[in-house]
Amino acid sequence: MSHAIDELQAIIADLKTELETEPKSSGGVASNSRLARDRIDRMSAEVVDSNPYSRLMALQRMNIVKDYERIRYKAVAIVGVGGVGSVTADMLTRCGIGKLILFDYDKVELANMNRLFFTPDQAGLSKVAAAAATLSFINPDVEIETHNYNITTVENFDRFLDTISQGGRIAGQPVDLVLSCVDNFEARMAINAACNERNLNWFESGVSENAVSGHIQFIRPGDTACFACAPPLVVAENIDEKTLKREGVCAASLPTTMGITAGFLVQNALKYLLNFGEVSDYLGYNALSDFFPKMTLKPNPQCDDRNCLVRQKEFQARPKPVLIEEKAVSEEPLHATNEWGIELVAEDAPESNTTPAETPVMGEGLRLAYEAPEKSSETSEETVSAATADETSLEDLMAQMKSM
């Protein structure tokens, strides 16, 4: 018995040694034993189980997207890889985006497990490193670039500005779209300032502290209101955000609300990048009543961001597109009086003398089963005379009966 116990202890010791000496991945955790698929050079529409893009390329066959493979030449920057940002990155990776640039300086915690995407074994890792490892395994065709710093500091803001200005799919070109998935006002203002300065279109997104509402907002510098044009109530009233949170009480979060908000964000990002459908300028979501408000916010002529004012002037100076109205071809009415061809005839109107219809020309061997007799004018006069005679005789008869 003791010999068996010694053998088991020796096996356990060997397993511990093996785990300690196992090679580590770049994220600091034991490398995943699962094998990632090989990279794919071109997207294929071939319908086979081994093609990860077959269902995406089907959008072309259904005339939703003209050329879906263009997505491989697009670069998107995601700022904030939390509840909304991580799911957004996951969806874009599965859609086959060409390049993802992730910004975040926070770490994965067990408190994040109520959200989607991250797993408990990633606790303690930086969010961008954990996300990059998972996303690369999901789709190795996507180029993923990570930046683990706070973009709101003066030094890091310049780095952020350079990255979104020159980090496109083609070196030296700007990214195609910036997605804001942050949870604080300072970071949103930093993204807003950078995009106004570089004239980049971007989406702002957010989920409320009570976790039952969310929104996305598409911001086109100069065309729609930037984030500084209509600041939230917290800033408009000069209230510190920290004073709104009671001590010991944290903001609530639901994976459902965050997943819905991320879905709206990615759906509209795809419509913008691939040029199909209608991109919503502002789309909200209220989970309590399933209410989805939509609106467009115009820029503020007195905006505090000077670059926003410059973009407004540039937008106003652009030539307005000329809309050519197509004149509808109106068909002439079937009847001069009404379009239904109905003609009203008074009851006391005299009957028109209609000529009998001509006998249609019949084919050889065919004949009419019935021919209506023609009414002559003499027959009509005789009928009227007979009726008059009958009426007179009846009156005489009545007079005779009364005299009896």
From Swiss-Prot:
ATP binds at G83, D104, K127, N150, N184. Residues 372-404 are annotated as: Disordered. Changing H335R: In strain: ZBMEL186. Zn(2+) binds at C226, C229, C303, C308. InterPro entries: D-isomer_DH_CS1, ThiF/MoeB/HesA, ThiF_NAD_FAD-bd, Ubiquitin-activating_enz. Pfam families: ThiF. One of its GO terms (molecular function) is UFM1 activating enzyme activity. It comes from the Eukaryota. Interacts (via C-terminus) with Ufc1. Interacts with Ufm1. This is Ubiquitin-like modifier-activating enzyme 5. The lineage of its organism: Eukaryota, Metazoa, Ecdysozoa, Arthropoda, Hexapoda.
